[in-house]
A protein has these predicted regions:
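Acidic/His- and Gly-rich active-site-bordering loop/insert found
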Residues: 2-102
């Protein structure tokens, strides 16, 4: 990475810091106990869409997972469990992929 590229990245982080802090504060203020993560998932999906990502949002079907190695018993209501994934597709596929999961 060149020094110029590094400086551009640092400047972009500095420029967006207040907005990112406000977004983080809004996110952590949303109650998200097990089984009630929906509002957090909604916010993440909205943020991804605003940034131009293709968003997939689906409910998790435990029957699809039961036979997979490592599956453990679920002892709580999982009927509202969802997964939200954002995908960015560049004009050309010339680089590496990055997955962020949380």
């Amino acid at each position: 990475m060149t020094a110029e590229t590094q400086q551009r990245i640092l400047a972009a982080v500095d420029e967006g810091f207040d907005a990112q802090l406000a977004t983080t504060q809004a996110f952590v203020a949303i109650p998200s106990t097990r089984g009630a993560e929906g509002p957090c998932q909604d916010m993440i999906g909205d943020l991804l869409r605003e940034r131009g990502y293709e968003v997939d949002d689906w409910h998790i079907n435990l029957d699809d997972l039961r036979d997979l190695r490592g599956f453990g018993p679920i002892e709580h209501d999982f009927s509202k469990a969802r997964t939200v994934v954002g995908t960015y597709r560049p004009a050309t596929n010339a680089g590496k992929s990055l997955i962020l999961q949380g």
